[in-house]
Regions:
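Conserved phosphate-donor/acceptor-positioning beta-strand/loop module used by diverse small-molecule
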Residues: 1-23
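Short hydrophobic/aromatic-enriched beta-strand-loop microsegments
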Residues: 4-11, 29-30, 117-120
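Conserved N-terminal glycine/acidic-rich loop preference
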Residues: 15-45
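PAPS-dependent sulfotransferases, especially Golgi type II membrane carbohydrate sulfotransferases
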Residues: 44-158
Length: 158
């Protein structure tokens, strides 16, 4: 797709993994309370979260879907693959979630995408609540690995 533009959002791995874990636990509760939700999600092929979760990547060290380490490992597999295979593509743009509340960042992103022609765009749309304190215990080793990948994306995005 040579004429396509791909926007790939990147979020701080610990914050992202915690958010994914919360969604997973939320869907597990919903599906335990109402089996129709579980069956419907299966029917439409949405197994990203919940009782019938299917990993996007085969877990290596962390198999417990109800623990943040599992979601950190999944983050690592996914974004390491994206970085290694797509970082040199001119039509792939990596959008750093934590910077979406920065007006200069948004303006530069729109200029790079040649989308800054509409001066009526509301550029201060995002209010990012970052750096939430994560209460879950996590493996610092897997977290360090995810941070290295995240920092590689930050370097691309200057």
């Amino acid at each position: 797709l040579p004429e396509s533009i791909f926007l790939i959002s990147i979020r701080d791995p610990l914050q992202h993994a915690f958010s994914l874990l919360k969604q997973h636990l939320n869907f597990c509760k919903l599906q335990r309370d109402d089996d129709f939700i579980r069956r419907y999600m299966n029917y439409i092929g949405h197994n990203e979260f919940g009782l019938n979760h299917i990993p996007l990547n085969k877990p290596i060290r962390y198999n417990d879907f109800n623990h943040i380490n599992y979601w950190l490992e999944q983050w690592l597999f996914f974004y390491e693959n994206i970085y290694n295979n797509y970082q040199s593509y001119q039509n792939c743009h990596f959008v750093i979630y934590e910077r979406l509340d920065n007006l200069r960042y948004i303006t530069k992103l729109l200029e790079n995408l040649d989308l800054n022609k509409n001066k009526n765009l509301k550029l201060n749309y995002f209010q990012i609540s970052t750096n939430k304190k994560i209460e879950s215990q996590y493996d610092n080793n897997i977290y360090r690995k995810t941070k290295l990948v995240y920092e590689n994306f930050l370097k691309l995005n200057r």
